[in-house]
Amino acid sequence: MVEAVLRHRRRRAVARTGEAAQRYAALGWPVCPGAYPPGHAHRPSGFPRSCSCDRMGCPAPGSHPVSPAWQNVASADPELVARWWTAMPLANVILPTGRVFDVLDVPAEAGLLAMSSMERSGLRPGPVALSPGDRAYFFVRSRGAPEDENEWWSCHLDCLPEKVADVAGLRWHCRDSYVLAPPSRTADAPQGRWLREPEANPLPDGVPLLEVLADACEQVGYDR
């Protein structure tokens, strides 16, 4: 009986991930399939794994794209997205940043504090998600990704996937980065979830949110 309930929950979780990918695509948000925790049934005896990829000691288990060419693969085409999750129903959902949106990424505690501050001041934050890694993601209007490098302005907060672990406080995911979207999951953490659901409304400018988020990070013990 217990095993039947667990199987039902796993099937429902898988369905929610595919449905979420379709919903993001309908908003015009490019997505691509992500690695996922393989689960006990997929772990050979004596060889525990926390990620579906073949990499030994994966540094970001369940939190990276399936394809190394994710920047070229990502799409908002509903038919393509449906095919991906039909072929890979367990896949997490990866959202590339720097296209439709950027993401301001802070520790969850700082994010909740910042949301309270924004509510008091009347500042609307736009979509906000909690990640399985105990981070809060604030989705904002993208700074863009111009083809001409001379038109690109960098920021000391810019965060690339391979540098995420080096930055404990405020991170700005823009071009060449990505985030794990709800309801994706990792091996030892709860599913990601939305605190403020995405809607078909214009995303907010990120600059007004920066000061509030930076202050919140400082209040909870982070200097960035």
Feature map (PLM): residue ranges:
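Catalytic core of tubulin tyrosine ligase-like
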Residues: 138
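Signature for HUH/AEP ssDNA processing cores
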Residues: 1-133, 142-144, 186, 199-203, ...
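DNA replication initiation modules
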Residues: 142-224
